[in-house]
Amino acid sequence: KVINIDLKDGDICVNLASQEGRQSAVDQLHTMCPDGLDGMICNAGVSGACGNLGLIISLNYFGTVAVANGVYDLLKKKHGSCVVTVSNTISQGAGRKDIVDLLNNIGDEKRVLSLVSSMDSTNLSVGNSLYVSTKYALARWVRRVSATWAANGVRINAVAPGNVHTAMTATMSTTAKMALNALPIPTKYGQE
């Protein structure tokens, strides 16, 4: 059985950008799947062009990490389960290392949100930098937990699918799309 967690149209309808929404998703999964989960795909996120810097941080990083950690015991019940998160190939160098370090080493959402609240949310380069930072931090988190999780029968990996036509990319401005298409990625846009 596939269970879809979404803001509006899921089997579990919650806001993964909020701590309450994440906990509700975890609680509902524990109720719906008491015998465990075979796997999970963490794919919720917003682009750097969304205009809400806090949302980028809360959804793209904390949403994934909190839900994955929250269902870890369910994943362990099904020895051989798998978690796939979505990172990004551009996340290796264009983000803010200070934000990446705060996300990975401190993990204090309120502190990071306080820091980004003083940034210019109307500046696309600021939003894109935070987007890249969350994806890089997510890849680092996956790398950090992967050995421990694997020892307990749970594989976890971050994939970088490249450009994909999704609801997120459909709302990007023409300038943002041109910048994205200028990246030297040897592929066409993928389909959702």
Where does each model-flagged region fall?
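A conserved structural motif in NAD(P)-dependent oxidoreductases
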Residues: 184-192
